[in-house]
Design a protein with these regions (language model features):
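Catalytic loop of short-chain dehydrogenase/reductase
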Residues: 25, 31-62, 67-75, 87-88
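C-terminal substrate-recognition "lid" of short-chain dehydrogenase/reductases
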Residues: 118-146, 151
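Substrate-binding pocket helix/loop in short-chain dehydrogenase/reductase
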Residues: 1-6, 32, 110
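A glycine/serine/threonine-rich, flexible loop-to-helix segment
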Residues: 47-49, 87-113, 153-165
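Generic structural signal for alpha-helix termini and adjacent loop/cap motifs
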Residues: 19, 27, 117, 134-136, ...
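Conserved Rossmann-fold SDR core element
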Residues: 64-67, 73-90, 95, 139-146
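A short, exposed helix-loop element centered on a Lys and neighboring polar residues
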Residues: 17-18, 68
Length: 165
């Protein structure tokens, strides 16, 4: 499993980037968006631990390093950024095989741990990608985390007691 995760998450991206880079540089306005997972931050902890193995987590952490390195290599003709996904439709969220294997309590634990109290939608991902492509011409080497606040956890900020500054 470890080798499969490294091959599909890191090696495949590198091969595509190396082949595409000359063409992207020639265009003068190339954009690369690396898709990654919050597994690179949370690993096997909390409610997400039932989805992510160590190889997947390590590979996704590595994507962030590739994003920063490739941003340096591509600049100024090519912008390279990363969209780090949490639990979204078609990727660990509702409607996926993994989601279907969870008990109701496990699903609720994931939702409760997410500040936005839901999984993401494909429309959420599309909006983020369009922003990165069209509306962020000065952004490169950046990780945009689209996780509904999962990494922050479900803890809310308590009100301060009266008289405390």
């Amino acid at each position: 499993q470890w080798d499969l995760e490294i091959d599909t998450c890191l090696r495949a991206k590198r091969w595509v980037f190396e082949e595409a880079l000359p063409h992207l540089k020639t265009s003068g306005n190339g954009v690369v968006i690396n898709i990654s997972s919050i597994a690179g931050i949370v690993g096997r902890t909390g409610p997400a631990g039932q989805f992510f193995n160590e190889g997947y987590a390590a590979a996704n952490r590595g994507i962030s390093l590739l994003t920063e390195t490739w941003a340096r290599i591509g600049a100024p003709e090519v912008r390279v950024n990363e969209l780090m996904l949490g639990f979204v439709e078609s990727r660990h969220g509702r409607g996926t095989r993994g989601w279907g294997l969870l008990s109701g309590d496990q699903k609720q634990a994931l939702i409760d741990h997410t500040l936005m109290a839901r999984t993401g939608t494909i429309a959420d991902v599309v909006k983020a990608v369009l922003f990165m492509l069209k509306d962020a011409p000065f952004m490169t080497g950046t990780v945009l985390r689209l996780d509904g606040g999962y990494v922050l956890g479900g803890d809310r900020v308590a009100a301060m007691p009266p008289g405390v500054l």
